[in-house]
Amino acid sequence: MKHISKVILVLLCILLSYPFYGMAQNIKSFDFKGNFFYNTITSIEQDTLGFMWLGLDNGVFLFDGYSLQPLIHSMISDRYVNFLSHRKTTLYIGTNEGLYAYNYINNQCDLCSPLLKSRNIIAYQCNSDYQVVATDREVFLFDYNWNFIHKITIYKESLNNHITSMVIYGNQEALLGTESGLVIIHIENDGKTKSNTLYSGDKIVQLFIDSRNKLWICRGEEILYSNIDTLDSVEISGFK
């Protein structure tokens, strides 16, 4: 009886190991250093066709399910890619030298606005009325034809403070993570803006709003969160 139990146990272990073995066999690895002159992956995005786009410190790569191919275009080649974002059939490429819109259906790449040329683009977001672009020091408001509406400068006099991240919610609020806290921008009906500091402290690395309408604030080794509808400096709760 003991012998039978041991056999059953061995068979069970073998059966349970198959899914993990299959998973390991299906994991693909790409060594950028071995074949390309790229070092750091900075972002990843999936488009409406299911293809994966990788932003690197020296350009953009496309993974079509079989292989990696560099996106070769004079406007974005050799650019440091801060982030990738997509809307409909357009991939938005935020670089240290401007924001570019790449239509992957027509294979066409354009600078979104001359105002953004040579600027360090940190984030791109949109709502039903506006397109909002954050550089490391400023926030630009555009309509959907990339006509300029308004610009707000954050920490104009501070040389050691920069915008690190941005999220928008509703049609009239944008939240900025900076190297020293959290700033909210209220967008008026006429497109004018005003800003207030909600929280001062350590550098904010990333902001995220979840499906329950809670704001997550990543500060390196610590995460803060708050209900976005009642956000103020008192109601932010922290956990590790």
List where the protein language model places each region.
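Carboxylate-rich, polar loop motifs that coordinate divalent cations or form catalytic acidic clusters
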Residues: 1-240
